[in-house]
Amino acid sequence: MRLGITCAPPHQTPAEWAGKLSSLGCRACVLPCDETTPEDVLEGYLAAARDADLRIAEVGAWSNPMSLDPETSRAAISLCQRRLAFAERIGAACCPNISGAVVGAGGQWDGPFAANYAPETYGRVVATTREIIDAVNPVRTFYTLEPMPWMIPDSPEEYVRLLRDVDRPGFAVHLDIANWIHSPRRYFGYREFVDECFRLLGPSVKSIHLKDVVLQGHLTTHLQECPCCTGGLDLAHYLRRASELDPDTPVLLEHLPDYQAYVESLARVCALC
């Protein structure tokens, strides 16, 4: 596996960017560029990543294809297609998004809504995922959906079903097990759940997010995401299972408030390896 962070360190040049990441022990990264970046700037970052042996882990396409607002949905699908094409161009491991929230304009794009589980929603997720992939037909990268606690896919079994029903070689798995820790049983049975995720999804995993969770002791159930190695999850076990995948599989830390927090959290994770 290749550890990395989603945060770009403060830098003035691509070489400085890559050098700082390497000095932290990173071997995976997120490029601080997108499809609108000038060609010469993009090439500079790509060269710096190659020289530092940094694998580009992902090109995020974070948007809401499931929006009930047609304009928002169309814009999201278009963004996903552009980002997937960019991921294909630069050879990123994957292009992740969420399936999306079934909500009108102005609603929380990644939020919990009953309609996320409506019978017709699953079919829409399959159809839009195909539409995104078929516009690009990637061969070097994959479109992926991030696991979520309150939308499709909310379990490894549902992700297996999606892989079958989308039925595209350009569709694969981005694994973020922390997002599936949505009950005390899952929290306390984390090691067994991790094993089940890797048993069902391991061959299709193209990238991983690494996060921690703490179960707080007040009513009602409150599971809070927290920096790695400060919660109750056995991240060493997660990393051991990740190390059994393709050795170039990226494992990224995310959702931390600033660069220094990433530095400190990554140091704790490296100590587990």
Descriptions of predicted regions:
Residues 7-15, 31-44, 64-74, 103-105, ...:
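Acidic-and-aromatic substrate-binding clefts and catalytic sites of carbohydrate-active enzymes
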Residues 14, 42, 76-80, 122-125, ...:
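Aromatic/hydrophobic pocket-lining residues that form the small-molecule binding cavity
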Residues 59, 127-227, 232:
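Acidic/histidine-rich catalytic cores of soluble enzymes
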Residues 31, 57-59, 93-101, 141-146, ...:
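Short beta-strand segments at enzyme active-site cores
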Residues 39-51, 80-91, 156-164, 192-206, ...:
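Short amphipathic alpha-helices and their capping/turn segments at secondary-structure boundaries
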Residues 1-93, 119, 130, 172-175, ...:
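N-terminal pre-domain/capping segments
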Residues 111-119, 152-165, 223-241, 261-273:
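Short, electropositive alpha-helical surface patch
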Residues 19, 51, 70-173:
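Active-site acidic/histidine proton-transfer and metal-coordination neighborhood
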